[in-house]
A protein has these predicted regions:
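Glycine-rich, proline-tolerant flexible connector loops at the mouths of alpha/beta enzymes
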Residues: 35-60
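Short, conserved active-site loops that position catalytic residues or coordinate cofactors/metal ions
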Residues: 31-41, 70-74
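Short secondary-structure boundary/capping segments within folded domains
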Residues: 26-28, 58-61
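Active-site-proximal loop/turn and secondary-structure-junction residues that shape catalytic pockets
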Residues: 10-12, 40-42, 74-76, 107-111, ...
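Histidine-acidic metal/acid-base catalytic patches
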Residues: 1-34, 89, 93-99, 143-166, ...
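Flexible, glycine- and charge-enriched loops at secondary-structure boundaries
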Residues: 14, 18-21, 47-50, 54, ...
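Active-site acidic/histidine proton-transfer and metal-coordination neighborhood
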Residues: 59-68, 73-163, 173, 243
Length: 254
């Protein structure tokens, strides 16, 4: 059975910014989650990203029995396709202070050259595992980009230097069939963001997959069964604790 992670944003972005992450780690642990994803963009101020603050948050999570993911909205590659070494190093430093198992970045503008040796140099000796996520934008959300990235890493001699966060709902946002993406990228997937999309155009919103969603079930079946699965859809604000417990149990067994 896969570990289930709750992403901080599931509790509402405003609620997390106002009350901090620590409050919601307690709710996540009580719901039976194995991990919690800290979102840098939901910090109330830069002080929350200090080494001291992150270490304190990480220690509090460890006492609750939770492991962590550290998510930053920064991109691994600039829009011009250049490796952003500064963004990568900063993310690794902050994730290490938190004690995170994974550090997650967006892919950004990767084009052809991965600069794999430089990535390997950055992650060498660091505990957090680097993963990149398919996003909602054209740049960084293209199936061809991700196929090309992993081909380039292998070609440059560093095939296992990073893994992938597979966001089911973001493929839908980009108009890509998640099952097609899963079949092509499964070997590289180490973490799964679970959500679907409802609505049209810019009014699309993340939501929980239905219990009888055959497409979602097929995607999970195509991905490695042991990788952690994260809840990245909003809970009902009127029954957050009950919703969290329900979806943790459901996703663990899905």
């Amino acid at each position: 059975m896969a570990d289930v992670v709750i992403v901080a944003s599931a509790f509402g972005m405003d609620a997390v910014r106002a009350g901090g992450h620590a409050k919601w780690t307690s709710v996540s642990a009580a719901a039976g989650a194995g991990g919690f994803e800290v979102r840098r963009e939901l910090f109330a101020s830069d002080a929350d990203a200090s080494v001291e603050a992150l270490r304190s948050l990480g220690n509090a999570m460890a006492k609750l029995g939770l492991w962590s993911v550290y998510s930053t909205p920064e991109c691994l590659y600039t829009p011009e396709g250049v490796l952003d070494v500064y963004a990568l190093r900063l993310a690794l430093i902050e994730a290490t202070a938190l004690g995170a198992r994974f550090v997650k970045l967006q892919l950004g503008g990767f084009a052809a050259h991965a600069n794999a040796a430089a990535i390997a140099a950055c992650v060498r000796g660091m505990s957090p595992r680097l993963v990149v996520e398919n996003g909602q934008l054209e740049q960084g959300g293209s199936l061809a980009q991700f196929v090309g990235l992993f081909d380039a890493l292998a070609r440059e001699g560093h095939a296992g230097v990073l893994g992938m966060t597979f966001d089911v709902g973001n493929w839908l946002w980009r108009g890509v069939a998640p099952l097609d993406a899963a079949q092509q990228l499964a070997a590289h997937v180490e973490y799964v963001h679970c959500k679907t999309m409802n609505g049209e155009g810019t009014r699309r919103l993340a939501s929980a997959p239905a219990a009888d969603d055959a497409q979602f079930a097929a995607v999970l079946a195509s991905l490695p069964p042991h990788v952690p699965r994260a809840i990245e859809f909003p809970f009902d604000a009127t029954r957050i604790e009950a919703d969290a417990a329900h979806y943790v149990a459901w996703l663990a067994a899905a």
